[in-house]
UniProtKB/Swiss-Prot annotation:
Predominant cellular place of this UniProt entry's protein: cytoplasm
Keyword Transferase: no
Keywords: Cytoplasm, Elongation factor, Protein biosynthesis
Gene designation: tsf
NCBIfam families for this protein: tsf
Organism: Levilactobacillus brevis (strain ATCC 367 / BCRC 12310 / CIP 105137 / JCM 1170 / LMG 11437 / NCIMB 947 / NCTC 947) (Lactobacillus brevis)
Ranges annotated as spanning the membrane: none
Gene Ontology molecular function: translation elongation factor activity
Similarity comment: family membership: Belongs to the EF-Ts family.
Region (Involved in Mg(2+) ion dislocation from EF-Tu): 81-84
Family annotation (PROSITE patterns): EF_TS_1
Domain of life: Bacteria
Stated name of the protein: Elongation factor Ts
Length: 294
């Protein structure tokens, strides 16, 4: 005869696992009221659900920066909808992942997923649990571990609560300056620290395109070279952080601003949630219904 499942048992299992009421009840029925077996059942069900959800497009989510001494971690964790991105459980997961990666500095994504968090579970286990709670595909998409020396400083900035994250390293400047540069990086999205970091083949290609563009405009060849250099300077100011007009003072470049504070640009990393992912057309009514249905 099947064991009768009480409301108290359902509440206890929900408190321990954060799953929905119906999932908790099903697990207790399947395990005949045995709490440990019910938890195992939910873990197995969560893994199955995570695998099922892994085919869904996860293009929302949050980016985060965590500093730990001379190490900083910048991460992006994705969800399917922005509903989940504002969920407390999802936010706690993002914080846990950022803390763990900053502390343990894994070499790649597989190593990161296998890391043990403060509560003894792995990052992968934590992701599976969050998938179980939210009924969405949740993924650690990418991360970077950034290092500095004792004489250098980090600056970090989150835009719109974590839709864009940036971390920079400056040499010889203070943290306030570094934060201003991080804000600039988040807003303007440079590709390289300086023109010296731009591959020669890309510069050569751009120079040739600009030359042909000027010739096609019918410009005399004797002034084409001067025009190309002027347009190339504009191109550099669009992709090189050092050459970009500083977002808080357009009369000076970022490198000039940093130099005025006694510093030098070292490196930066910028993540924008969902960049490069083809997003499905939003259907608000369906998103709401999916949340209701769990």
């Amino acid at each position: 005869m099947a064991s009768k499942i009480t409301a108290a048992q359902v509440k206890e299992l929900r408190d321990k696992t954060q799953v929905g009421m119906m999932d908790a009840k099903k697990a207790l029925v399947a395990s005949e009221g045995d709490m440990d077996k019910a938890i195992d059942f939910l873990r197995e069900k969560g893994i199955a659900k995570a695998k099922k959800k892994s085919g869904n497009v996860a293009a929302n989510g949050l980016a985060r920066v965590k500093e730990d001494g001379n190490t900083a971690a910048i991460i992006e964790v994705n969800s399917e909808t922005d509903f989940v991105a504002t969920n407390d459980t999802f936010n706690a997961l993002v914080d846990t992942i950022a803390d763990t990666i900053a502390e343990k500095q894994p070499a790649d994504l597989d190593a990161a997923l296998a890391l043990t968090t403060a509560d003894g579970s792995t990052i992968n286990d934590a992701i599976v649990k969050t998938t179980q709670v939210t009924s969405e595909n949740v993924q650690l998409r990418r991360f970077a571990v950034v290092k500095k020396t004792d004489g250098q400083v980090f600056g970090s900035y989150l835009h719109q609560g974590g839709q864009i994250a940036a971390v920079v390293v400056l040499d010889g400047a203070d943290e306030a300056t570094a934060k201003d540069v991080a804000m600039h990086v988040a807003a303007i999205n440079p590709e390289f620290v300086s023109r010296d970091d731009i591959p020669a083949e890309r510069l050569d290609h751009e120079r040739e395109v600009l030359k042909q563009e000027a010739l096609n405009e019918g410009k005399p060849e004797k002034i084409v070279e001067k025009m190309v250099e002027g347009r190339l300077h504009k191109f550099l100011s669009e992709i090189s952080l050092a050459d970009q007009p500083f977002v808080k003072d357009g009369d000076q470049t970022v490198s000039q601003f940093v130099a005025s504070k006694g510093g030098k640009l070292v490196t930066f990393v910028r993540y924008e949630v969902g960049e490069g992912i083809e997003k499905p057309v939003a259907d608000l009514a369906k998103e709401v219904q999916d949340q209701i249905n769990g």
